[in-house]
């Protein structure tokens, strides 16, 4: 089954907690802190795979979790990093943030990958918090939470040539004649319900051809699921309009105008692509008597054309020569851009601009907006007196207390920092943690 859209949830691994431990060695009566750091949580990575052609798997499994980092251990042993989770998708998959609609990545090359959720950093062990005045720290950091988000996946086929036409124009028969594809073929409209891909092998060039399900008037408004299909030709280099010469209801010229109109209304850029008109089914008597009239119209149209019979194989080589010619020209005219295999860095972490801390009022609560301070608060057990003392010194050094004063926070008012609620003490110009 061909599925080209999916929604999934991804959760990166949490970082492991730092360890509180002390040296317990013979002949070392006063061993210092020896708590190891927690391991980093695994990232969630999406990777393009040219051997896949559908998003069907994501309709059966929607939730994906990377491994968490191990906790630190005594003797300064660092916890093991969590294993990254690699999710494979077909090449041509676009990844969107489901909440914001932001395009995260467009995976157009085999092996191309992007980090969609980053694992949390491991917490620091108590070794990091030893000072001349705090020689035996009884606290460590908890690991950071891994990122989590919902994603929309959308597949747009990567093909060099797109076959477009009204229902029952003979596109599937043509695809089966020129490529290795084996689409369903039947003498009635809408046999093709999903796009089919085929590979055409010529003497010194290989290119892909996509058979797009039949379009009807109103396709750009998703009539006959046209909107679902039209996006699959957005990436093609060349369009071949397959037109039934024997159709007595919709003459070739009218069929061509319908197709042009639907493509234009969906995206005017589609008509900027090179076009070839393939007049099909010329072996049928109904078509034979109309050929002079059709040829007269085509000469005035000024678009390359060829009369074919996909069923009987008539003039298929001529059509392939035209396809090859335009594919070559288009590929030569498009500058070669080296595609980054890694769209975002994986291990080093992202580069973030330094944010300016601020204190804002929301109803009866003040809230500190400062990622660094919020992150540190969430990593520490602030009900531990030593940890709270360390945090209090940190917010003074970072200028958070001065910021609170400038915001005119009154004595006894509550301030939220990370997951904790504090009360401001104006007399001591400090924060007191609430139970």
Swiss-Prot record:
GO terms for molecular function: GTP binding; GTPase activity; magnesium ion binding. Residues 159-328 form the OBG-type G domain. InterPro entries: G_OBG (IPR031167), GTP-bd (IPR006073), GTP-bd_Obg/CgtA (IPR014100), GTP-bd_prot_GTP1/OBG_C_sf (IPR036346), GTP1_OBG_dom (IPR006169), GTP1_OBG_dom_sf (IPR036726), OBG_GTPase (IPR045086), OCT_dom (IPR015349). Its EC number is 3.6.5.-. Its cofactor is Mg(2+). GO terms for biological process: ribosome biogenesis. One of its GO terms (cellular component) is cytoplasm. Residues 343-426 form the OCT domain. Signal peptide: none annotated. Mg(2+) binds at residues 172, 192. Keywords: Cytoplasm, GTP-binding, Hydrolase, Magnesium, Metal-binding, Nucleotide-binding. Residues 1-158 form the Obg domain. An essential GTPase which binds GTP, GDP and possibly (p)ppGpp with moderate affinity, with high nucleotide exchange rates and a fairly low GTP hydrolysis rate. Plays a role in control of the cell cycle, stress response, ribosome biogenesis and in those bacteria that undergo differentiation, in morphogenesis control. Belongs to the TRAFAC class OBG-HflX-like GTPase superfamily. OBG GTPase family. Monomer. This is GTPase Obg.
């Amino acid at each position: 089954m061909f599925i080209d859209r999916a929604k999934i949830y991804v959760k990166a691994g949490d970082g492991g907690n730092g360890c509180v431990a002390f040296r317990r060695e013979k002949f070392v009566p006063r061993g210092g802190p020896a708590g190891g750091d927690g391991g980093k949580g695994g990232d969630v990575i999406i990777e393009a795979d040219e051997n896949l052609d559908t998003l069907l798997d994501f309709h059966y499994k929607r939730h994906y979790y990377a491994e968490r980092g191990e906790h630190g251990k005594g003797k300064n042993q660092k916890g093991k990093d969590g294993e990254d989770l690699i999710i494979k998708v077909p090449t041509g998959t676009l990844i969107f943030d489901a909440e914001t609609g932001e395009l995260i990545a467009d995976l157009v090359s085999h092996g191309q990958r992007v980090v969609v959720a980053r694992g949390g950093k491991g917490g620091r062990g108590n070794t990091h918090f030893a000072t001349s005045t705090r020689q035996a720290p009884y606290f460590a950091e908890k690991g950071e939470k891994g990122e989590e988000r919902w994603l929309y996946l959308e597949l747009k086929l990567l093909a060099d040539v797109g076959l477009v036409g009204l229902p029952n124009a003979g596109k599937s028969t043509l695809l089966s004649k020129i490529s290795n594809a084996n689409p369903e073929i039947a003498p009635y409209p809408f046999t093709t319900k999903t796009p089919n891909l085929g590979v055409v092998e010529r003497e010194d060039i290989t290119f892909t051809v996509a058979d797009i399900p039949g379009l009807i008037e109103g396709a750009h408004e998703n009539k006959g699921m046209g909107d679902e299909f039209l996006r699959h030709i957005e990436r093609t280099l060349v369009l071949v309009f397959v037109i039934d010469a024997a159709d007595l209801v919709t003459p070739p010229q009218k069929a061509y105008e319908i197709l042009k109109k639907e493509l234009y209304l969906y995206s005017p850029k589609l008509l900027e692509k090179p076009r070839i008109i393939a007049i099909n089914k010329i072996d049928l008597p109904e078509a034979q008597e109309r050929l002079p009239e059709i040829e007269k119209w085509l000469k005035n149209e000024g678009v390359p054309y060829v009369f074919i019979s996909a069923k009987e194989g008539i003039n298929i080589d001529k059509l392939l020569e035209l396809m090859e010619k335009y594919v070559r020209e288009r590929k030569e005219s498009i500058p070669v851009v080296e595609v980054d295999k890694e769209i975002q860095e994986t291990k080093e972490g992202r580069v973030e601009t330094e944010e300016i801390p601020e204190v804002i009022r929301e109803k009866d609560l003040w809230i500190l907006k400062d990622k660094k301070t919020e992150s540190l608060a969430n990593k520490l057990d602030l009900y531990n007196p030593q940890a709270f003392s360390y945090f209090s010194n940190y917010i003074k050094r970072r200028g958070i207390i001065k910021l609170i004063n400038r915001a005119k926070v009154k004595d006894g008012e509550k301030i939220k920092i990370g997951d904790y609620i504090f009360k401001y003490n104006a007399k001591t110009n400090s924060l007191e943690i609430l139970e």
